[in-house]
């Protein structure tokens, strides 16, 4: 079952995402689009874009949530917002939440993601050798 563009657009906007750069949706740290991006959402179908004028006719089998590090001021907070938004899509529109290897996300997978973020931030803070 595919996701309808109009339903995705309404849900993304309700979750505070803005259409922007690269024709995809982004969640910014502040309500203005000049603040750092916490995470982004793209269509799983090439080219991955969500053009506003195409949303009424859009139908996609999947969407990808992703974040870049370094990027957000608080990476863990950005991850939690991204996870909550992805879970909101599943609750409201169906589908399954999967990881970067396309395996179903479990509480253990989610905790592993958090550990990877903590490790990345620890390395960013440690003095360079």
Task: Report each predicted region and the residues it spans.
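Short glycine-rich or small-residue beta-strand-to-loop segments that form or flank ligand, phosphate
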Residues: 1, 12, 64-70
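Short, highly charged
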Residues: 1-53
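Generic detector of leucine side chains in alpha-helical contexts
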Residues: 8-11, 17, 58, 83, ...
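Short glycine-/polar-rich loops that comprise or flank the Walker A/P-loop
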Residues: 23, 60-63
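A broadly tuned preference for mixed-charge, low-complexity surface segments
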Residues: 40-56, 115-127
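Internal insertion modules embedded within essential enzymes
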Residues: 53-60, 75
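Well-ordered alpha/beta subsegment
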Residues: 65-129
């Amino acid at each position: 079952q595919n996701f309808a563009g109009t339903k995705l657009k309404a849900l993304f906007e309700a979750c505070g995402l803005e259409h922007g750069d690269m024709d995809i949706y982004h969640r910014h740290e502040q309500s203005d689009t000049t603040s750092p991006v916490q995470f982004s959402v793209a269509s799983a179908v090439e080219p991955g874009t969500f053009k506003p004028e195409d949303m009424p006719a859009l139908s996609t089998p999947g969407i990808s949530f992703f974040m870049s590090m370094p990027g957000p001021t608080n990476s863990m907070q950005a991850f939690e917002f991204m996870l909550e938004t992805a879970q909101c899509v599943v609750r409201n529109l169906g589908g399954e939440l999967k990881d970067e290897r396309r395996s179903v996300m479990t509480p253990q997978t989610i905790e592993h993601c958090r550990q990877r973020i903590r490790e990345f931030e620890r390395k960013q803070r440690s003095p360079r050798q």
